[in-house]
A protein has these predicted regions:
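Rossmann-fold NAD(P)H-dependent dehydrogenase/reductase core
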Residues: 2-272, 362-366
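C-terminal/domain-terminus segments
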Residues: 141, 246-256, 317-340
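A catalytic-pocket lid/entrance helix-loop region that shapes and gates access to the active site
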Residues: 272-275, 340, 351
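Short, flexible loop/turn segments with low-complexity composition
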Residues: 320, 365-369
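C-terminal functional modules
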Residues: 354-355, 359
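Extended hydrophobic/aromatic segments used for targeting, binding, or gating
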Residues: 38, 65-68, 99, 263-298, ...
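Short glycine/proline-rich turn/loop motifs
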Residues: 210-222, 281-288, 332-337
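C-terminal helical subdomain
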Residues: 283-335, 345-346
Length: 369
């Protein structure tokens, strides 16, 4: 899958039988910090990264999830290449699972402080965690009172990024990877379904905690997710702008994995499935099994692992990669255009500023950048 990841010509069959390329995460050993590594494509990426010999720090919501992850990854770590530069090949030397609950900025601040105290440089910071509550009629709230989709998918990630940026800039060929989605763009197939993404003047975020939507409108679960993915791109672009202005260099890669619907009960759609089990089952049957428009978690995980570790042609700057459907069973992973709103520099600066203010007002330590 990832031979020629950067060639713009990577076309993959989307049937369930094709084997993922074993070279997905090959390359010099890197320290990768990953969110959303306990399930879905994040877990698949974590497995491939460990198997390829990289060192992982995976944020976990609580001690129980950290223990479960260790149990899953222990046998995978034993399959790592023999010729590793690490003197200690134990799982404990290659996997750290600090507690950092993305729905609680206090937990994220505590986690970031521990990582900063430890002081280990981060080569690749992978902000991958995300949730969606399709079909929900009422908003859920984070510990600080922000709508939960926005809080987890964007706000906690910006807080983490701002705090850990010094460690990232100390890394080897440092890289930021942010998981977004094609639905951020109202002109794409997924973006056209339901209300489109749109932040307007960020009236809801200006209000602070308690706003159901970033634009100040009434709650809509699908739009909340689309808006959060738009925020991911604006955040990534604004960081790139700030660093360029300061003379700093960083590879900033945002990407869309495509539509990933696992066959089990876990993965990204686990929350939406609880809201509308019949509708989600029907959607999966049509999109995955009949039309074959979906990507498998294994291949999406391989793409994420490759973005985190393989060498891109351009060592610095922002790029957006998308895994787009060409037809039944065929997808192309290539550099793509982001939406018109995602290219709005003024909106990116305002979102960053208001998000940083919201984080600071929640008791977070002063942010870098």
């Amino acid at each position: 899958v990832l031979k020629g990841l950067w060639s713009h010509k990577n076309v993959m069959a989307a049937d369930g039988d094709q084997k993922v390329d074993d070279n997905a995460a090959q390359g010099p050993s890197r320290h990768v910090l990953l969110t959303g590594g306990n399930s879905g494509i994040g877990l698949q990426a974590a497995m491939q990264l460990l198997q390829a010999g990289h060192r992982l720090t995976v944020l976990c919501r609580d001690a129980a999830s950290a223990e479960r992850l260790g149990q899953v990854l222990a046998p995978v770590a034993q399959q790592a290449p023999v010729e590793q530069p690490l003197a200690d090949q134990s799982l404990g030397a290659r996997l750290a699972t600090p507690i950092g609950d993305l729905s609680d900025l206090t937990s994220i601040e505590r986690c970031a402080a521990e990582l900063l105290t430890a002081g280990e440089p981060i080569d690749s910071l992978v902000l991958n965690a995300g949730l969606q509550y399709s079909g929900a009629s009422e908003p859920r709230w984070s510990a600080q009172g922000f709508e939960l989709t926005f809080a987890v998918n964007h706000l906690a990630h910006q807080a983490l990024l701002q705090r850990l940026l010094p460690l990232l800039l100390q890394g080897t060929a440092p890289r930021l990877v942010v998981t977004s989605s094609e639905v951020h763009d109202p002109t794409t197939a997924g973006g056209k379904v339901g209300q489109p993404a749109g932040l307007a003047d960020l009236a809801g975020l200006r209000q602070g905690a308690g706003a159901a939507m970033l634009d100040g409108g009434p709650f809509n679960a699908e739009k909340a997710y689309k808006d959060s993915k738009l925020c991911n791109l604006l955040m990534a672009r604004e960081l790139d702008r700030q660093l360029r202005q300061q003379g700093q260099s960083l590879q900033v890669l945002a990407w869309s994995p495509g539509l990933v619907i696992p066959r089990g009960s876990g993965g990204f759609f686990r929350y939406s499935r609880s809201q509308n089990p019949f509708g989600q089952a029907l959607f999966a049957l049509i999109a995955r099994d009949l039309l074959r428009l979906t990507e498998t978690p294994q291949r999406a995980g391989a793409l994420l692992a490759g973005l985190a570790t393989s060498s891109p042609p351009d060592p610095v700057g922002f790029q957006y990669w998308s895994n787009r459907v060409l037809g039944p069973g065929r997808l192309r992973f290539a550099v793509s255009e982001i939406s018109l709103e995602a290219r709005n520099d003024d909106l990116a600066r305002e979102l960053w500023s208001l998000s940083a203010e919201a984080v600071a007002n929640s008791g977070f330590q002063p942010a870098a950048a």
